[in-house]
């Protein structure tokens, strides 16, 4: 997969699908997940509907630049945040969501794309929101999927989902792949597919196993704060999609996002958790195609 320099110290790995002459759609993935989490079949199906689809690895993930020179001790970081020692927490994390948003926009620049439709899932939704807030002239439309506003009162995880998210991941391939089945904790209750979760985990492990980046991405997310006031002023056409089965980011996160952004459309999806089950792809793709028309 190709990679391009988006700044003096960051290169981003990406893959594109479809005709470059079609309207560009940038897919932004979430916390700790590689571009593979935007399934290739999903990307091709969206491209077949007349969109030029670009997926990419965020910094500190996949084949993009790693920040090994800034190790984060998760225990110390969580203790600092929990105790309110934000100066100490801030000093541990080398970047914020704004930097991750700049990476995505830098990728578009490197590809010669001035403006694009931006679709972000989970933390990727937060990054996509930040793109639209920081450079609205470059974002044709925003689709914020299974995400939230950065306000602590909305989009909270259930204790069960949080326990799975922060459980230590096995370092060996077999253990890592087996543990992925536990992500059913936040998946669609109807369509949750442990085999598909393990298949993605195996592909991700083989491509670029890199647990060290998770702490820095978490820090960027936690320390970037609330976007609520800024979202009230956003004028980019916005679609908010959230699964009603989501226990990792409660649907209140999506509802709140749509409440804040003037004119935003809210699509609450039954039988969808913090995932994109293949059975729901037609509905999700229809929604994105309609919003980006």
What do the PLM-derived regions correspond to, one by one?
Residues 234, 240-242:
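Short beta-strand/loop motif that positions the catalytic acidic residue
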Residues 175-216:
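Conserved alpha/beta-hydrolase catalytic His-Asp/Glu region
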Residues 142-171:
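Flexible "cap/lid" loop of the alpha/beta hydrolase fold
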Residues 264-293:
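Catalytic active-site module of serine/aspartate enzymes centered on a nucleophile-bearing elbow/loop
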Residues 8-87:
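Conserved HGGG/HGGXW glycine-rich cap/lid loop of the alpha/beta-hydrolase fold
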Residues 245-249:
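Acidic catalytic loop of the alpha/beta-hydrolase fold
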Residues 114-153:
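Conserved hydrolase catalytic core segment
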Residues 86-87, 91-94, 98-116:
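Conserved acidic catalytic loop of the alpha/beta-hydrolase fold
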